[in-house]
Structures are given as C-alpha cells and as structure tokens.
Amino acid sequence: MQTDTFKDKVVIVTGGANGIGRCISDEFRNQGAIVYVIDKQEGEHYVGDISKKEVLEAFAIEVLSKHNKVDVIVNNALPLMKGIDECSYEEFQYALSVGVTASFYLVKLFMSHLADGASIINISSSRDRMS
C-alpha cells in the first residue's frame, strides 16, 4: 500500500539490492521516501564495496550533492559468514569492515547532515544460518 508517511524524506540503505535490504528500500519508496541504496551487486543503485573508505566517501558526496539532509540511515549490509572453523582471518576482517567499520564511517560522513529527529538503524542477523 502506498502512503506518504515518509514523503520527501531522504533514506540511505546499505545492502539494499536484495533480501531484507531490498524490502526495506521498497517499503520506504512506497511511503514516499527518496531512497539511496549502496550495494556491491550491480543494479540501478550506487554500486560499491562499502568496506572501502573511498567508496563510502564518494557515495556521501553523491547523496549530499542532491540533498542537504538525511532522515534515515539503515545499515543493513553484511557479508555471508562461515563458522569459526571455516572462516579465514581475511574473511573475518572483511566482515568487520562491512558490518562494523562501514556503519560507523557512513554515519560519521552524514552526521552534520542528519535532519532533526533522524534515525539510524543497524541491522544484524544470523537467521541465514537457521533457515
């Protein structure tokens, strides 16, 4: 159902090309938001690996060149993880870069542009290993 609950609100969603992130992005759009997705997967959104500082900086410049405020940041991107016995040090470091460092840095980049009453939503789940 389409409403205008978030009409003209600027929303950022990491990992918004598929799954939960895609549903979140679609729902915000259905409620009138202007949604910016960043994802590693090719598509009609900003494509980039958020584990890289320069990618996050370029994304922030892109968003802020069009809007001077951000109302919602949804940190949703997380790489698939293996169990501790199968996960290499490098894979774990990458997971930390995407799931922790990128979330911190993205908020830091937009901090002075957050609208009054802005929301920061951090999503974490291990459900993919339970289904």
Task: For each feature predicted by the language model, list its residue ranges.
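Canonical Rossmann dinucleotide-binding motif of NAD(H)/NADP(H)-dependent dehydrogenases/reductases
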Residues: 4-35
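Rossmann-fold cofactor-recognition segment
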Residues: 40-54
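Conserved catalytic-site loops of classical short-chain dehydrogenases/reductases
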Residues: 71-72, 93, 118-123
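Conserved NAD(P)H cofactor-binding loop of Rossmann-fold oxidoreductase domains
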Residues: 76-81
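Substrate-binding pocket helix/loop in short-chain dehydrogenase/reductase
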Residues: 83-93
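A short, exposed helix-loop element centered on a Lys and neighboring polar residues
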Residues: 107-108
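Catalytic loop of short-chain dehydrogenase/reductase
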Residues: 121-131
